[in-house]
Swiss-Prot record:
It comes from Ranoidea raniformis (Southern bell frog). This is Aurein-4.4. Signal peptide: none annotated. GO terms for cellular component: extracellular region. Belongs to the frog skin active peptide (FSAP) family. Aurein subfamily. The lineage of its organism: Eukaryota, Metazoa, Chordata, Craniata, Vertebrata. It is found in: Secreted. The keyword Secreted applies.
Length: 23
């Protein structure tokens, strides 16, 4: 559903931020 898609996108953004901070 739409909510699941939003959750996945938020997780992708969070992961990207974490990787960006670490590097």
């Amino acid at each position: 559903g739409l909510l699941q898609t939003i959750k996945e996108k938020l997780k992708e953004l969070a992961t990207g931020l974490v990787i960006g901070v670490q590097s």
